[in-house]
């Protein structure tokens, strides 16, 4: 039985992880749960999964949870709070693997703690590689930790790679193992066929109407701009030690093929499945074995045809910007990620037009010139500066 700490247990990935645990009670045991301020959901999780330890973001939430656990007869569960406690729970001796699903910068140090403690790290936190790719891969090289990707695209690529590359993830030479290209697929989002002339008038409702996946508003907008694919491109470069020439991004509107790997003999290996995050989560949790995920099997006879097209960078300037930012370095990708969060929030609030998202992102990356970060603290300084600049510049865009 594998033992587990879940960082971000009350979020989407965290609850899906617990769904896989629920479906496989003899395979996994939850030792620790870490979350933000959602006491109600954490209480429900404690009742069902009986962790030994729980950590909330602040002492106020922790105190409220302690009281409610005591009232339920679960007062033996140790309730902690704060980032330091989250790092401790990520590095527990009794834990085999850590689901790193805390969103944003708050997840960086706990994920790094898990790597330094030689855990199997199931990586769902985008910021870990988008903002700290070099730092995380250096930490991985000095530890015996194993990284397994949770993003559906990166997990699909992982499954399609040779075992030797899987076992040296981030360090193996793709060419030496017969791999010529990694093919990152994306649906193209809900605006794929909208005339470019109509982009200025796109509303948040339009941008959030994803055709295949059920997602939050921020990531739905990122899908519409294909910034999500740009961030996944950055992650893939680090995860698979891939050069720009070894990367390919294509649009696949049906979201059935989650990504592919090309080999020198002309073979292409792909991973297919219904669009449900429980599939990659179950794969990573059980690797190298397989367990039921609870996801309905793919019905090929009802699936219909699959189509592909090249991304139009005039339609998706955020994708092009992410590719360029990776070539510039970690400071640029950190600035881009931070600026995009500000830009998307402003769009959702009605303060920016849809087309201003890419314009604002580019201005921040071009204007904010910083030295390459050599620690997480330096990354956070760049992140903060980029957010401040994006806020200032966004005021100059008028609807």
From Swiss-Prot:
The question of whether Oxidoreductase is a record keyword is answered with yes
Q: Which InterPro entries match?
A: DXP_reductoisomerase, DXP_reductoisomerase_C, DXP_reductoisomerase_N, DXPR_C, DXPR_C_sf, NAD(P)-bd_dom_sf
MF GO annotations? 1-deoxy-D-xylulose-5-phosphate reductoisomerase activity; manganese ion binding; NADPH binding
Per the record, a Pfam family? DXP_reductoisom
Keyword vocabulary terms for this entry: Isoprene biosynthesis, Manganese, Metal-binding, NADP, Oxidoreductase
Reaction catalysed by this enzyme:
2-C-methyl-D-erythritol 4-phosphate + NADP(+) = 1-deoxy-D-xylulose 5-phosphate + NADPH + H(+)
Going by the record, the broad EC class of this enzyme is oxidoreductase
GO annotation, biological process: isopentenyl diphosphate biosynthetic process, methylerythritol 4-phosphate pathway involved in terpenoid biosynthetic process
User: For binding 1-deoxy-D-xylulose 5-phosphate, which residues are annotated in this chain's numbering?
Assistant: 126, 152-153, 187, 210, 223, 228-229, 232
Q: Is Transferase one of the keywords UniProt gives this record?
A: no
Q: In which pathway does it act?
A: Isoprenoid biosynthesis; isopentenyl diphosphate biosynthesis via DXP pathway; isopentenyl diphosphate from 1-deoxy-D-xylulose 5-phosphate: step 1/6
Cofactors required: Mg(2+); Mn(2+)
Enzyme Commission code = 1.1.1.267
Q: What SUPFAM superfamilies is this protein classified in?
A: 1-deoxy-D-xylulose-5-phosphate reductoisomerase, C-terminal domain, Glyceraldehyde-3-phosphate dehydrogenase-like, C-terminal domain, NAD(P)-binding Rossmann-fold domains
Query: Quaternary state and partners of this protein?
Result: Homodimer.
What family does the database annotate?
A: Belongs to the DXR family.
Q: What does this protein do?
A: Catalyzes the NADPH-dependent rearrangement and reduction of 1-deoxy-D-xylulose-5-phosphate (DXP) to 2-C-methyl-D-erythritol 4-phosphate (MEP).
Entry protein name: 1-deoxy-D-xylulose 5-phosphate reductoisomerase
Q: What organism is this sequence from? A: Edwardsiella ictaluri (strain 93-146)
Supply the gene name: dxr
């Amino acid at each position: 039985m594998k033992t587990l700490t879940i960082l971000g247990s009350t979020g989407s990935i965290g609850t899906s992880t617990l769904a896989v645990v629920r479906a496989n009670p003899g395979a996994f045991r939850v030792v620790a749960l870490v979350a933000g301020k959602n006491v109600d959901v954490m209480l429900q999780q404690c009742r069902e999964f009986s962790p030994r330890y729980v950590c909330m973001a602040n002492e106020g939430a922790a105190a409220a949870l302690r009281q409610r656990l005591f009232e339920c007869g679960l007062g033996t569960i140790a309730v902690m709070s704060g980032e330091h406690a989250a790092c401790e729970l990520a590095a527990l001796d009794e834990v085999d693997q850590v689901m790193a699903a805390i969103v944003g910068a708050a997840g960086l140090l706990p994920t790094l703690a898990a790597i330094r403690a030689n855990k199997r790290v199931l990586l769902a936190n985008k910021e870990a590689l988008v903002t700290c790719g070099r730092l995380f891969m250096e930490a991985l090289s000095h530890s015996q930790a194993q990284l397994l990707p949770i993003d559906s695209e990166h997990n699909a690529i992982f499954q399609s790679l040779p075992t030797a590359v899987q076992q040296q993830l981030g360090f193996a030479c793709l060419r030496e193992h017969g791999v010529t290209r990694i093919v990152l697929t994306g649906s193209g989002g809900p605006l794929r066929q909208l005339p470019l002339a109509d982009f200025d008038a796109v509303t948040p409702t339009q941008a959030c109407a994803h055709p295949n996946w059920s997602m939050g508003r921020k990531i739905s907008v990122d899908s519409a701009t294909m910034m999500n694919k740009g961030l996944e491109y950055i992650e893939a470069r680090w995860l698979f030690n891939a050069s720009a020439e070894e990367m390919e991004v294509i649009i696949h509107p049906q979201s059935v093929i989650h990504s592919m790997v090309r080999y020198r003999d002309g073979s292409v290996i792909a991973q297919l499945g219904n669009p449900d995050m429980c599939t990659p989560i179950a794969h990573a949790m059980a690797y190298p074995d397989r367990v039921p995920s609870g996801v309905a099997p793919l019905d090929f006879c009802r699936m219909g045809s699959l189509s592909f097209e090249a991304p139009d960078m005039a339609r998706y300037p955020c994708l092009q910007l992410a590719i360029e930012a990776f070539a510039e370095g970690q400071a640029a990708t950190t600035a881009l990620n931070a600026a995009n969060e500000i830009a998307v929030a402003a769009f959702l609030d009605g303060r920016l037009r849809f087309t201003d998202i890419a314009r604002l992102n580019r201005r921040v990356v071009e204007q904010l010139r910083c030295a390459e970060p050599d620690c997480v603290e330096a990354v956070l300084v760049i992140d903060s500066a980029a957010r401040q600049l994006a806020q200032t510049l966004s005021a100059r865009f008028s609807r």
